[in-house]
Amino acid sequence: MGWERTKATTMELPGEPSFTGWLLAGGVAAVTGILLFILHASDMVKALAVFNIWWLASSPVLGWFFLFCLRGWLWGRTVSEHQFLQKEAEYGQQQWEVWAGRYLAVLGSSILLPSGVTSDAIAKSDAADAPQFLSLTSHFDAKSTTSTSLLGLGLASVQNAVAMLPATVPFNVTIVSDMISSNFETRFRESWEKIYPGRALTGSISCCEALSFAWIEERLKNPVFDIDLILILQNQGAEQYSDALAALILTSDDVAEKYHLPHSARILRPMLLDMPNFRADMGLFLETQTIACQTSKVFCDYGHWNDWFADLMTASQSHLTPWVPQEIDVLEKYNGIPGAGSAWLLAALLSDITLVGKAPVLGLFTSGTDRFVSTITSGSNNNDAG
């Protein structure tokens, strides 16, 4: 279900009164007054004799002047009402844009793709000659397929980002993996101590097989000052999905601003899509998270998003987006079938791509049975914000 947004009431400004028409009416009133004066003075109409000649002669002009002032007052009130409603609508739109523009700051990110493909090459469109995996791929070295070694690779990939984190802020770890066992947390702690000796884990550690992309929305609603590491590790897909390894260090915008944390990218508030109403939802999304209209490209995690590209392009026409259907890219092309962590894998890839391309991109994410859309933008490393 998409965002429930009630738009402010507005009104069309009617056409302004015709000044020429009112001048003509004033002329007619003046002529009528002159005729009444002549009729009264000549005693041609005895019934007019009971009236004061000057009041009688001036009454058409006075009546016209009264109606002219009344029409001007009514028009002024209509204009004032229109301006008030317009300002209210603009203010409401600004508030919605601020709400939709809240983000999780990406303090560090990495993703391991097969065959030497890098996010840098994808961002620069240099990955066209790389092998395309639209099925399954097992790309981890057989010697490094233990959970301990893969945990070490994931932690080492964000080593520079971890080193810059303030020690006073709680650091939570969420491991999304298909290799979880009873001693998995112990192995993680051992890998952590090996790579980050002397740096204590100050927050919680949780392990799960899937993490909904709706976690971002919940994280933005939660006013807790902490930092989260999300580690995606897939190596047991067999015939269902491909290997994957990615890491994201995230925190909410208020934490990034309070501690002036440099960040490479921003994941803006995602919108849960109602797929039967996909076109309408995309229109609402583009009206609300307006920076999405400036995105240079569109990326999705699974190839099944192809079925919705026509509706996507139709919804975007009125918003003048620069998207071209042929340039919509798919994570599955580079990594094979993404699996349960597809949304987070795409988020990690787009964070890297945004850092390289320095332009916002639109992401279409699959998380279980849910579908999301969000904008990934440059972070404080590329602009004055944050």
Spans of features found by a protein language model:
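A short, small-residue-rich loop immediately preceding and capping a beta-strand
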Residues: 229-231
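Conserved "HGTGT" condensation-loop signature of ketosynthase/thiolase-family condensing enzymes
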Residues: 1-225, 234-239, 246-386
